[in-house]
Design a protein with these regions (language model features):
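Acidic, polar-rich low-complexity tracts and alpha-helical solenoid repeat scaffolds
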Residues: 1-197
Length: 197
């Protein structure tokens, strides 16, 4: 990280002293990566946005969009999560949701980019993380007796994140919620859906 901090300083100086021209343009692209590697994800995100705004027709603008999506998740990972080893799904997932949206935009804009495979891989991870977080909330509601709220959360995951690894967990929560609400016939329908999977 130390070398990248030095790189950030050098690249920022190039940008400051030579704000126009090819060197500044390349320095701004390199600055995104240097911030990212030094762990300054907020600055990497901001540098990505700045590059996109200043150079929308640059041949490497796909890289800026890609890095924007990659940094959003890390920006809110937080020190407390690292110290207390919180489950990823129990942390604030605002950044993960923003990262998902940014990477989805990247996929739509640049389907032929060299970064497409890495973006897809990260999207799968984020999709499962978001689904898991939603279902952690649903399980919290189950424990508190808020069965309708739990049912809504599980239903949200099944409707909006259908390809997640959390599908079975969502169905289990729906089944428990229906039983607790006295709707055994709906619980049986959920069981028949489970049998199809």
């Amino acid at each position: 990280a130390q070398n990248y901090l030095g790189a950030v300083d050098s690249l920022a100086r190039i940008e400051r002293f030579y704000p126009f021209g090819d060197y500044a343009e390349q320095a701004r692209a390199d600055l995104i990566y240097a911030y990212y590697m030094s762990g300054d994800y907020d600055q990497a995100y901001a540098a990505s946005e700045k590059f996109i705004r200043l150079y929308p027709r640059n041949t490497n603008v796909d890289y800026a969009y890609f890095m924007k999506g990659m940094t959003g998740y890390y920006a809110d990972e937080g020190l407390l999560g690292n110290i207390f080893s919180l489950s990823l799904s129990k942390r604030d997932i605002t950044g993960a949701m923003q990262s998902y949206a940014d990477l989805t935009e990247f996929l739509i804009r640049y389907p032929e980019s060299e970064y497409i495979d890495a973006a897809r891989e990260r999207l799968i991870f984020l999709r499962n993380l978001i689904a898991s977080s939603e279902l952690d909330g649903a399980e919290y509601y189950l424990k508190r007796g808020a069965y309708l709220a739990a049912l809504n959360r599980a239903n949200y995951v099944l409707k909006n994140i259908p390809n997640s690894t959390e599908k079975q967990r969502a169905l289990d929560i729906m089944k428990k919620s229906f039983i607790e609400l006295g709707y055994e016939e709906y619980a049986e329908k959920v069981s028949s859906v489970e049998a199809l999977n």
